[in-house]
Amino acid sequence: MSSPERIFPGKYYLCLEPVKSMLKTKKMKSVIFNLLIITIMTCACTPKNAQDPAKWSDSEVKSWFDKGEWKQGWAVAPDASIDQREFAIQYHKNPEVWNKAFTFLKSTPLDTLSKGRHEIDGDFLYANADQYTTKNEEVAKFEAHRKYADIQYVISGNERIGVRPLADGEITEDYVDAKDVLFLKYADKNYQAADPGKFFIFFPADAHSPGVKADTNMVVHKVVLKVRIN
């Protein structure tokens, strides 16, 4: 076979070099473009599934919850009544606000909180602190909310909190939008002990009856963080 020099002698052969280089460049660009498309599609799909707790298995939900990074270093334990999957779903919808909530609980000297509302992030997140005497079971009411989730923590003292599914209750007072509350009653109250060693989280599907006396009526110092979810 004849060499390129014999077919295209001298300067004519040299003119082919840019053409050959351009062909190589176009081929390389095509390869790079295809790789970019594959990478973008992979990145677009994988994180979406990874960050959608509604699609996680029960073991994946438990692993994420038990790891506890979402607590932002707050040492208090979550109560076993917390709906772990619902919390994972709500957390991943708005991690910034939930992180602010637990950072507040970790970094604030809670025993110094005065009664009333404490601003954190406007109507998206705020804390209500209160001091009250626990009430007898017969006068306690179950309540539920639609716009906010509650993080409830007894700073000092102890009480019981009834925890029941909203769907199982009988409504005794209709929902009042201005107060974001409705009231219900249940035959089975399912009381859980609440003390400084653990905290509770209640979502719209969770009816709860806080402030019920444990062994005796006592003064309780408590903080409730209101986290906007709807």
Named regions from a protein language model:
Residues 199, 217-230:
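A short hydrophobic beta-strand segment most commonly corresponding to one strand
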Residues 49-50, 61-129, 139:
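A short, N-terminal "cap"/entry segment at the start of jelly-roll beta-barrel domains
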Residues 109-173:
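Mid-length scaffold segments of soluble, non-membrane domains
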Residues 159-194:
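A short beta-strand-loop-beta hairpin characteristic of the jelly-roll/cupin
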Residues 193-211:
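Conserved metal-binding segment of the jelly-roll/cupin
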Residues 1-56:
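Bacterial Sec-dependent N-terminal signal peptides
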Residues 212-216:
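Short proline/glycine-enriched turn/loop segments at secondary-structure junctions
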Residues 165, 204, 227-229:
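Short, structured patches in soluble enzyme cores that scaffold and shape functional sites
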